[in-house]
């Protein structure tokens, strides 16, 4: 059910960009962050990717992506959990869901994230498993 809700949400956001011929303008919350993949666990039904980064606005963040496959195995849906530590007294958590696809060895992911406190982000993530790197862009939805 969560996956279906995430997929519908992403599709709705993309359809808003074409409503009345107006483009959807999203504001970046920060510059692009570089990801470091810390582990990948591959299974028959899903793959789990763990990564970390240093965000300008959230501080040190640890993320887990659980990817389910489509019939072709080159995309699907996923869920996300993240924890961030801005300083010794400030922590935040977020959860979300999205869609992913693979082009060659690169994985492209689009997710909606509900951050503790009511903030909603659209994240666009590109992962390069071969080099254990990636990029993470964060856009303000709410």
Model-derived regions, located:
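Beta-strand-enriched cores of mature, soluble protein domains
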Residues: 18-142
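Sec-dependent signal peptide recognition
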Residues: 1-8
């Amino acid at each position: 059910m969560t996956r279906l809700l995430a997929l519908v949400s992403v599709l709705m956001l993309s359809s808003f960009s074409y409503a009345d011929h107006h483009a959807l303008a999203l504001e970046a919350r920060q510059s692009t962050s570089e990801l470091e993949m810390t582990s990948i666990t591959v299974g028959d039904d899903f793959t789990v990717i763990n990564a970390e980064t240093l965000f300008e606005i959230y501080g040190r963040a640890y993320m887990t992506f659980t990817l389910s496959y489509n019939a072709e195995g080159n995309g699907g849906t996923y869920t996300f959990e993240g924890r961030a530590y801005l300083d010794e007294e400030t922590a935040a958590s977020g959860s979300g869901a999205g869609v992913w696809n693979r082009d060659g060895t690169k994985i492209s992911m689009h997710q909606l994230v509900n951050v503790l406190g009511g903030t909603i982000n659209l994240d666009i993530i590109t992962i390069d498993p071969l080099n254990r790197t990636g990029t993470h862009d964060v856009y303000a939805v709410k």
